[in-house]
Amino acid sequence: AFAGILADADITAALAACKAEGTFTHGVFFTKIGLKGKSAADIKKVFGIIDQDKSDFVEEDELKLFLQNFSAGARALTDAETATFLKAGDSDGDGKIGVDEFAAMVKG
């Protein structure tokens, strides 16, 4: 799904770095996966993949399964990790992350 945007080796390394529960940090993940240096168009493509229900927002349930977008066998985020991730990205307080909020969080 991320072919042409993210390198498989970067995805593998990023997932390995947060394999244990409680170790996911979005900033570290976005850096390791190589997303920070990508164009706005590529970041928008990644957002579109993560937005499973195509609502133009990433909601809490989609964030919980965030890592599984990159590898089907990846773990779900813990409730605490999900809450921290949502709080970091939800700048307008509506309980979900839009594409502009996601891009701002990636560029962090």
From Swiss-Prot:
InterPro entries: EF-hand-dom_pair, EF_Hand_1_Ca_BS, EF_hand_dom, Parvalbumin
Any further remark recorded for this protein: Is regarded as an important allergen.
Origin: domain of life: Eukaryota
Any one GO MF annotation of this record: calcium ion binding
Pfam hit, one: EF-hand_7
Taxonomic classification: Eukaryota, Metazoa, Chordata, Craniata, Vertebrata
Record bears the keyword Heme: no
Protein residues bound to Ca(2+) 2: D90, D92, D94, K96, E101
Domain EF-hand: 38-73, 77-108
Residues forming coiled coils: none
Residues where Ca(2+) 1 binds: D51, D53, S55, F57, E59, E62
Modification N-acetylalanine, positions: A1
CC terms in the record's Gene Ontology section: cytoplasm
Listed name of the protein: Parvalbumin beta 1
Organism field: Merluccius australis australis (Austral hake)
